[in-house]
């Protein structure tokens, strides 16, 4: 059988785009904690010595945005000019307006309610925008994620951990990982290449210090004993291939909310509708429906209805009911895909208000989603990672 290579990347919490995501979600959480019905769309731009926050907010809450910005940056580890950024002394500008009344009327008073087609409370909330959202799951890992992105995230988290714990004390917060996996058909069989790029202090030897430390303290703990049938012997290791990575963080590159949407999802292994997540409250289906589609796809795979599942949903702004649902199982289904799709429509309510209710999305839980992936981490607050509907799906699909 033909063998092919697939690659996914991850970034650490200190990557400039991820700093921006964490600031935006930190502001969102602060507002939701005081007013769960807050409407929030906050974008962050971070560059050398400066942070700019802009967007639209309608809320009864108050958030000290400059304080949130500084606390987020300091918590990540940018606390000195030697690291290229200092959260205590950077400039912060804020430009926040209110949500458009034209959008609000469609969200608060959905098409179905306005036209008299329904009086259901769940039909009262329309989608906050048009668009299509995808979810994906596969049986490659215990968390039902593709192997390349799952391993890339593990390495990024470990890279940050050894920096924070002082195991590799000369590391700085900015970093990236990339993993290439060899596939035989649809099955991952071999780790081919691992790339790690990490910001570091000055005068650190790449060959005699950084590369051995990355191999021993970052990669080895994650790949040794990984199991899952993956051959992890003799993979190629690349560490800081430019030869030096002293200038990093916002000094090296400007960061912007929503610029790591593939890192946030499935590492390019599945399709993406294009909408970013961070800084958006759950009335925005870009976020809430993408979470719901992960929930759907994961339950399809957990139910044994398919080994791989991609689910797409689409909405019209101001309408509660989706305009379409599409389920793809790539020939791995155990029952006809039409039955799976029908079971999904019976078991899951994909109206925005129902998604928010079922996944408990009005809680201030979003800061923890903003780095290391929104999917595949089975944390208590990540309700979309639950497989609580698998038995119902299996029963309705007649499996």
From Swiss-Prot:
It catalyses: L-methionine + ATP + H2O = S-adenosyl-L-methionine + phosphate + diphosphate. GO terms for cellular component: cytoplasm. Its EC number is 2.5.1.6. Residues 99-109 are annotated as: Flexible loop. Its main location: cytoplasm. InterPro entries: ADOMET_SYNTHASE_CS, S-AdoMet_synt_C, S-AdoMet_synt_central, S-AdoMet_synt_N, S-AdoMet_synthetase, S-AdoMet_synthetase_sfam. It is an enzyme of class 2 (transferase). GO terms for biological process: one-carbon metabolic process; S-adenosylmethionine biosynthetic process. SUPFAM superfamilies: S-adenosylmethionine synthetase. ATP binds at residues 15, 174-176, 244-245, 253, 259-260, 276, 280. Belongs to the AdoMet synthase family. Homotetramer; dimer of dimers. This is S-adenosylmethionine synthase. It comes from Salinispora arenicola (strain CNS-205).
